[in-house]
């Protein structure tokens, strides 16, 4: 029996081999204990402030919205150490691993941001680190691969399947099932078997807590909408978490529309998927009529995933959050637009969320609205991808 509720409505659960159940129960127990431990909280808070660089600013776009009555604020997770929101939860998980006396960390990565974060948290806390990464993602994220290796991590190429994030996840789980006694699986998003979605949400909720305080201080009111990209969904659930009970605030998750929903070259399981079992959880997934997992597609490696975290599936089913899609082309346009107008280069993942905010602004230019976009990471890693896309 789990100590915490393992489901969000109908979604979630622990669909893993029996051999992994003791490791998941141990993780849940340590997580609950740590949340009650003032020593753990102080240690994590100290790392977030003095190592990671929290709090991150909430930046008002001064040029992007000229000529309209829209205000767009950017939550600047790109300014964290490591360059993305991943830092928040890897520090928490690394501390949990130390408390459980684990010697090794196993992780998966798509865009490489979680891999980089896992690598530096292991370097900081003296843990061995091995990271599984799809061959396709290795080829498009060479800079992050080198960063991981530079910090002492072993990067293991995954050549099976489509050579992307889902295949890296499968290999990481396989490794963990063989080595769970000495190793902790540092899952990179708010997905997978319980208790991972709950743990990752807890450690990412700092984004939403800060954002709410900051926007009330700046505007003396709540925003009209909070917008975030959704792959597995950790940055989105992190910023959504503080606003879920505020029904006046629209929560908008942006999935990768890839080359267009009509082409099947996309990664939008919430709006164009079915309920199924994948990666240890019951959630919305992209699958064929025969139940086989479809290959997802996105210009953004971090969104190239055929499933989504179970809490997003629940928010979608209850209609508390709205989920939309943005194509590769629209995301690249937003990437260029923010870079040129504000001097901020966003990750391609975050550019999906920004693109939808720009749609809302352009559709209602004279509407007084306050939009918050979570800039989940910086775009240095994506320069070559965008350059090749534009053939510059």
Curated annotation (Swiss-Prot):
Recorded GO CC terms: cytoplasm
PROSITE patterns for the chain: TRP_SYNTHASE_BETA
Protein EC: 4.2.1.20
Record Gene3D superfamilies: 3.40.50.1100
The UniProt record lists the keyword Phosphoprotein: no
InterPro entries (alphabetical): Trp_synth_b_CS (IPR006653), Trp_synth_beta (IPR006654), Trp_synth_beta/beta-like (IPR023026), TrpB-like_PALP (IPR001926), TrpB-like_PALP_sf (IPR036052)
Catalysed reactions listed for this entry: (1S,2R)-1-C-(indol-3-yl)glycerol 3-phosphate + L-serine = D-glyceraldehyde 3-phosphate + L-tryptophan + H2O
GO molecular function: tryptophan synthase activity
Top EC class of this enzyme: lyase
Required cofactor(s): pyridoxal 5'-phosphate
Pfam families per the UniProt record, alphabetical: PALP (PF00291)
Modification type N6-(pyridoxal phosphate)lysine: residues: 86
Keyword annotations of the record: Amino-acid biosynthesis, Aromatic amino acid biosynthesis, Lyase, Pyridoxal phosphate, Tryptophan biosynthesis
Pathway the protein acts in: Amino-acid biosynthesis; L-tryptophan biosynthesis; L-tryptophan from chorismate: step 5/5
Record-linked NCBIfam families: trpB
Subunit record text: Tetramer of two alpha and two beta chains.
UniProt function note: The beta subunit is responsible for the synthesis of L-tryptophan from indole and L-serine.
PANTHER family per record: TRYPTOPHAN SYNTHASE (PTHR48077:SF3), TRYPTOPHAN SYNTHASE-RELATED (PTHR48077)
Family: Belongs to the TrpB family.
Record HAMAP family: Trp_synth_beta (MF_00133)
Protein name, UniProt field: Tryptophan synthase beta chain
Organism expressing this protein natively: Buchnera aphidicola subsp. Melaphis rhois
Gene: trpB
């Amino acid at each position: 029996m789990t100590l915490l509720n393992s489901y969000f409505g109908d979604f979630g659960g622990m669909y893993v081999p029996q051999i992994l159940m003791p490791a998941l129960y141990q993780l849940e127990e340590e997580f609950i204990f740590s949340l009650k431990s003032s020593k753990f909280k102080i240690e994590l808070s100290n790392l977030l402030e003095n190592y990671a660089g929290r709090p991150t600013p909430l930046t008002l776009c001064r040029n992007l919205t000229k000529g309209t009555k829209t205000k767009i604020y950017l939550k600047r997770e790109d300014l964290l150490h490591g360059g993305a929101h991943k830092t928040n939860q890897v520090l928490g998980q690394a501390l949990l691993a130390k408390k459980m006396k684990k010697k090794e960390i196993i992780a998966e990565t798509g865009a490489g941001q979680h891999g980089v974060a896992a690598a530096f948290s292991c370097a900081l806390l003296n843990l061995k680190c091995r990271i599984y990464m799809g061959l396709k993602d290795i080829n498009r994220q060479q800079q992050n691969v080198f960063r991981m290796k530079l910090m002492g991590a072993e990067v293991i190429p995954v050549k099976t399947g489509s050579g992307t994030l889902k295949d890296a996840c499968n290999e990481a789980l396989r490794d963990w099932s063989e080595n769970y006694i000495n190793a902790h699986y540092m899952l990179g998003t708010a997905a997978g078997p319980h208790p991972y979605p709950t743990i990752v949400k807890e450690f990412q909720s700092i984004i939403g807590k800060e954002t709410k305080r900051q926007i009330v201080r700046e505007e003396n009111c709540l925003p009209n909408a909070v917008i975030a990209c959704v792959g597995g969904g950790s940055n989105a659930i992190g910023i959504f978490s503080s606003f879920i009970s505020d029904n006046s605030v629209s929560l908008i998750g942006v999935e990768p529309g890839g080359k267009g929903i009509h082409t099947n070259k996309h990664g939008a399981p919430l709006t164009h998927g079915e309920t199924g079992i994948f990666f240890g959880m019951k959630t919305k997934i992209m699958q064929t009529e025969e139940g086989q997992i479809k290959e997802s597609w996105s210009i953004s490696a971090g969104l190239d995933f055929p499933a989504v975290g179970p809490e997003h599936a629940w928010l979608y089913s209850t209609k508390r959050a709205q989920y939309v899609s943005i194509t590769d082309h629209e995301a690249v346009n937003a990437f260029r637009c923010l870079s040129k107008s504000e001097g901020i280069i966003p990750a391609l993942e975050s550019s999906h969320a920004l693109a939808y905010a720009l749609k809302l602004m352009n559709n209602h230019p004279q509407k007084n609205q306050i939009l918050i976009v979570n800039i989940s990471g910086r775009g240095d890693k994506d320069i070559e991808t965008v350059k090749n896309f534009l053939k510059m």
